[in-house]
């Protein structure tokens, strides 16, 4: 299994590539070729936090993914990220997890790239 940190991703994946990836993803969704159900939200009221889970499956790409974004505002008080996130990449043929990525950076890239993909 591949483990990719923010630094690893920066070395191999540019914002231009992220824009192109977003365009492909939007096309797959628009064409009904991607199963991307609504995200699941689980509250952690004791800690003023929540867990968000966003799965997707694209048969054409033989791939699935799961992004977990956790929002815990109190983390700022102890020097931890407020929105830590991870992305699991999963082989669509076998169900085996093939990579774990820094989801915080991936989310930042995707947010910017979505704007670029719109033009």
Functional labels for PLM-detected ranges:
Residues 1-110, 114-116:
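N-terminal ligand-binding/catalytic initiation module
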